Curated annotation (Swiss-Prot):
Protein name per Swiss-Prot or TrEMBL: Tropomyosin alpha-3 chain
Record-listed Phosphoserine modification sites: 51, 179
InterPro entries, sorted: Tropomyosin (IPR000533), XRCC4-like_C (IPR014751)
Region annotation (Disordered) ranges: 21-42
Amino acid sequence: MAGSTTIEAVKRKIQVLQQQADDAEERAERLQREVEGERRAREQAEAEVASLNRRIQLVEEELDRAQERLATALQKLEEAEKAADESERGMKVIENRALKDEEKMELQEIQLKEAKHIAEEADRKYEEVARKLVIIEGDLERTEERAELAESRCREMDEQIRLMDQNLKCLSAAEEKYSQKEDKYEEEIKILTDKLKEAETRAEFAERSVAKLEKTIDDLEDKLKCTKEEHLCTQRMLDQTLLDLNEM
């Protein structure tokens, strides 16, 4: 009975030990699985760390390149800002120049209008002088005809005719000058403005020439009248002499 109890006790103990062994083996397997899981987790973590390190390195390299690009961009930005400042200053200078040019153009337009007005006035004076010259030329031609008729009758008029021819040459030269001035009036407004005073001076000279020519014509007509009277007196004396000779 006691032996049976001992066997039972031994069996129970063996069962307990077997259970403990199974439990231990199960725990060992579980621990092995945990160890294996931890190993895989560690390997995965190490791989992730290595990947992170590579990513960090790539990020650092990318950061370096980004910093270089940033430095380049900042430098370009600074240059662009300087260029923009210079452009702005240039624009201000151009705007100031444009404003001055506009003011200058307005002034030139005013001067151009004044020059046109003065030129029109000068043209009017010139046309008036030219008409007077035409009239005087006609009078001079008629005077020349009368002078030539008087020359055929009286040789004393040769000197006066020579003077009249000289005056006629002067008149032709003056007419040529007026023709040249008329061509100059058709030049550009700027040249007209620059030479306006000269044109007015020439117009005044032409008026003085006209006055001189009119006086010359008057003098020639007076001299022609005197010559006719002298010729008439001479003719009367000649007729009287012939009459006296016939009576003798």
